[in-house]
Amino acid sequence: MKTFSAGRTDVGRKRENNEDSFHTDDQVGLYIVADGMGGHRAGEVASSTVVSSVKDYMEAFHTSPVAQETDESNMSPAATAVCHSIELANRVVYQLSQDQGSYKGMGSTAAVAYLHGDTLVTANVGDSRIYLVREDNIEQLTQDHTLFAEHIRKNPNWDPNSASIPMKHILVRAVGIHEAVEADVYEMQPLPGDLVILCSDGLTDMLSDDEIHQAVLAGGELEEVCSRLVDMANEKGGLDNVTAVVFFLQKEEKGLLHKLFGSK
């Protein structure tokens, strides 16, 4: 399968700096979104460090996919490599925060998608999400690592409208905050015509899953889809930096989504 992608990031309507970073590479099949945090531009450093660390590690693996040291989780070499790339990013960001006072306490989310052969590996830390759009459905492939999401998982019958949770956006997991981090890693078999979205919470805090889905189904070039998503988030208030990366998969022959998105 071939992939076609686009990405866009925007500072939003309320922030002075953009602390989001992203990366797309259709040749490698690698897509990354990171949302940094920390004062004095430290968030920008954290997110860009996550992106560069994951990118460098995965490019090396893609060029020469050597066997990866693994535990007993039965992950594929590709999934293990993605996991290791995030662990590397965590060590680099954490060490920077320890070595430079202005970076103390900085951290970042990470959302990574990697297409290796017929397997799509997705991984995340924090609340940057990955969605799968398949035909008429949209599915969140990742779980948010926030106080709010954790409360929902522990209390599945709780009505989120019944009471507010203080600091519900506080992350319970982030890259670079501690010496070690655990990423959620998933593997799936994608289908031709699948479309995948990676995004920061600046998008998902402003738009519902259904609004994101409708923005994708409206079609156009992939660049238009990214811009539509970002513009919609800004129109809703743009309270945070907004980043959207989209890519879709197809066989060599041109199918429905090729016509919808008018890829090259």
What kind of region is each of these model predictions?
Residues 1-264:
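PP2C/PPM-type serine/threonine phosphatase catalytic domain
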